[in-house]
């Protein structure tokens, strides 16, 4: 039996980030055996002519395309989508983020906006990361063509159940908690707010309080953020409260996730969708501190999975909520079971497989109908 051919048009690692990790998980899974996968890497915009040529000569049954959320990237995407439509190719796009609608409504020209509406309307389907993000494509494509595929924590970053139980048990009598920020150092991601939380902790301890939190940071710096980070830590003498790990992966990342108790991502990043780092933290039985931004509320509920900060909360109020938390072990184990049952790698792959199968079956049925009509 011939396998259906799926062409994946996306950014592949390196570097490793949320999007590239998601498609890498697909390529290195059973889907690579079930389908004949073809890869077209779009991370080098200078190679756009080469990308177009590869698409033109591809005989894939389905094109799976992860779209951009920048003005320039959108122009490239429109060119690719126009080519696929001209060639009457079956196309499914996957939005790994939550900014696309704001991009085309606010950031691009009227002509580019109109082109986007026309391009989306002509697609066979779109995928978003969570239920609340379906609104991004409302009015652009019929609702039944909007699919939800939630992100996952890869198996290598999920604790075995027995280890998760033991970790939660140790939280009962633990006096000092390790708080982890694991993301890129972008201002809108909220790392500066985490530094201010570390400063509040230092001031409280200096006023005869017992140390309750140590803050661990890991990720890649962008622009001048490394200078800001180092200057802040040095100016406020936070070396006893802050540890910088740099970029981590593999065993180092596993170790950091295992050793930390609370995960913090106070993000307001415009392009945010459903952060994989939050899912990985849940898979390591961690208490979550985050915001009601993008698709995060579909995953984290305030009081149930941790603290979900609204836009009007002050840093002092957030710190007070951290101090007031009790029974962390129950919340952390609940987060672990949620990740295993809902955000596992197997669930993610099954969801992708299901959407692909739906669209490919439609194509097969259409071909059969056409052949029968010719008889």
Descriptions of predicted regions:
Residues 258-272, 286:
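Acidic donor-binding loop of glycosyltransferase active sites
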Residues 227-248:
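Nucleotide-activated donor-binding/catalytic signature segment of Leloir-type glycosyltransferases, i.e.
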Residues 41, 182, 213-228, 246-247:
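Glycosyltransferase donor-sugar binding loop
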Residues 283, 287-290:
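Short hydrophobic beta-strand element within catalytic cores of glycosyltransferases
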Residues 117, 121-161:
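Donor nucleotide-sugar binding/catalytic pocket of nucleotide-sugar-dependent glycosyltransferases
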Residues 6-8, 165-200, 216:
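Conserved donor-binding/catalytic core segment of Leloir-type glycosyltransferases
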Residues 302-313, 321-326:
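Conserved acidic donor-binding segment of nucleotide-sugar-dependent glycosyltransferases
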Residues 313, 326-357:
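A charged, aromatic-enriched C-terminal amphipathic alpha-helix characteristic of glycosyltransferases
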């Amino acid at each position: 039996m011939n396998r259906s051919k799926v062409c994946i048009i996306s950014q592949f690692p390196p570097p490793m980030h949320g999007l590239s990790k998601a498609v890498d998980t697909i390529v290195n899974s059973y889907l690579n055996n079930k389908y004949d996968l073809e890869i077209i890497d779009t991370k080098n915009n200078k190679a756009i002519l080469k990308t177009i040529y590869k698409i033109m000569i591809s005989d894939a049954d389905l094109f799976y395309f992860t779209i951009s959320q920048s003005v320039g990237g959108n122009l490239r995407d429109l060119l690719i989508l126009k080519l696929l439509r001209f060639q009457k190719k079956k196309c499914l796009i996957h939005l790994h983020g939550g900014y696309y609608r704001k991009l085309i409504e606010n950031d691009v020209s009227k002509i580019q906006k109109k082109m986007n509406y026309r391009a989306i309307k002509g697609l066979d389907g779109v995928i978003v990361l969570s239920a609340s993000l379906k609104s991004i494509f409302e009015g652009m494509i019929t609702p039944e063509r909007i699919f939800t595929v939630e992100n996952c924590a890869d198996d290598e970053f999920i604790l075995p159940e027995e280890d998760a139980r033991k970790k939660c048990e140790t939280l009962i009598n633990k006096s000092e908690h390790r708080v982890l920020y694991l993301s890129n150092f972008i201002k809108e991601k909220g790392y500066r707010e985490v530094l201010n939380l570390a400063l509040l902790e230092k001031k409280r301890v200096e006023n005869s309080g017992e140390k309750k939190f140590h803050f661990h940071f890991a990720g890649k710096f962008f622009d001048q953020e490394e200078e800001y980070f180092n200057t802040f830590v040095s100016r406020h003498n936070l070396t006893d409260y802050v540890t910088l790990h740099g970029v981590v992966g593999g065993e180092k990342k596993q170790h950091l996730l295992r050793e930390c108790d609370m995960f913090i991502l106070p993000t307001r990043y415009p392009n945010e969708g459903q952060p994989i780092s939050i899912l990985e933290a849940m898979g390591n039985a961690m208490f979550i501190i985050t915001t009601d931004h993008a698709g995060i509320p579909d995953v984290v509920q305030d009081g149930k999975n941790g603290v979900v900060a609204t836009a009007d909360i002050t840093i002092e109020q957030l710190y007070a909520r951290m101090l007031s938390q009790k029974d962390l072990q129950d919340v952390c184990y609940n987060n672990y079971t949620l990740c295993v049952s809902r955000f596992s790698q197997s669930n993610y792959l099954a969801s992708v497989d299901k959407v692909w199968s739906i669209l490919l079956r439609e194509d097969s049925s259409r071909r059969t109908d056409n052949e029968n009509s010719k008889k």
